[in-house]
């Protein structure tokens, strides 16, 4: 089990950790720091937006693509810590994590509710939380970790909810050790009917619609070369240090 002492290897010295429950720690003084998921539409999101047929029909990809990306990320190195920034409920990736216990993994999210759902998913698959994994209640936009702590950073579906992504990408790059890699997914406009749906969510303030040119212009400005593939309205991205 990754305990507080082990976590101190990667947690910034000025960050205080609070034990919440077995396998879950928080960087906050109490549980009142809530994400929009906690406050608004969590159950609906987990039931609808995580449905594989919904994602295939509307957005043009299979949720199994997340599993494949996560497996590739975990296999990208044989050593070093892994960070999943904004891990959510592990709706798409729990099986990938449950099947890979070689590397130490920090699963970070600002929603304590989502972390508990993620924990329950791992327990359902494995009978317990794998000893190489720990949950941290914290903000992916202000990573509470020492620089260059992680060999692999994963972040699924976080970029498209941010008005500006430069700061988050810089945070991730600062947290990446030499020879490491970042793996990301984000919804984009891609000349499909679902673009209208994306813009509708944009007007509601839930997502920020971008096309591929606008997205990758930010990576280029940060001198972060990327490899990517696009399926429907989803971009699957990797960037090496």
Where are the regions a protein language model picked out?
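Conserved class I S-adenosyl-L-methionine
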Residues: 6-76, 91, 95, 114, 183-206
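Short alpha-helix
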Residues: 206-223
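A conserved beta-strand element that flanks and buttresses the S-adenosyl-L-methionine
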Residues: 154
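Short catalytic micro-motifs in class I SAM-dependent methyltransferases
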Residues: 157-158
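Class I SAM-dependent methyltransferase SAM/SAH-binding core
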Residues: 81-142
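A short glycine-rich, Lys/Arg-flanked "PGG" loop and its adjoining helix->strand segment in the class I
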Residues: 166-181
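Core SAM-dependent methyltransferase catalytic element
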Residues: 221-241
């Amino acid at each position: 089990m990754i305990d507080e002492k082990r976590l101190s290897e990667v947690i910034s010295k000025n960050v205080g950790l609070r034990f919440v429950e077995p396998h879950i720690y928080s960087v906050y003084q109490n549980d009142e720091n809530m994400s929009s998921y906690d406050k608004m539409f969590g159950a609906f999101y987990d039931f609808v937006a995580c449905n594989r047929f919904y994602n295939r029909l509307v957005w043009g990809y299979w949720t199994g693509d997340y599993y494949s990306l996560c497996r590739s990320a975990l296999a990208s190195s044989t050593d070093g810590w892994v960070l999943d920034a904004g891990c959510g409920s592990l709706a798409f990736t729990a099986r990938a994590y449950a099947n890979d216990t070689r590397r130490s993994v920090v699963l970070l999210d600002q929603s304590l509710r989502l972390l508990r759902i993620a924990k329950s998913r791992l327990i359902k698959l494995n009978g317990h939380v794998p000893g190489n994994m720990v949950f941290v209640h914290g903000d992916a936009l202000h990573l509470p970790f020492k620089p260059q702590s992680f060999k692999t950073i994963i972040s699924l579906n976080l970029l498209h909810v941010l008005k500006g992504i430069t700061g988050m990408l810089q945070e991730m790059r600062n947290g990446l050790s030499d020879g490491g890699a970042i793996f990301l997914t984000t919804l984009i406009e891609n000349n499909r009917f679902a673009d209208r749906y994306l813009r509708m969510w944009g007007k509601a303030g839930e997502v920020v619609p971008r096309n591929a040119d606008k997205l990758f212009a930010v990576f280029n400005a940060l001198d972060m070369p990327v490899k990517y593939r696009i399926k429907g309205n989803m971009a699957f991205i990797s960037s090496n240090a």
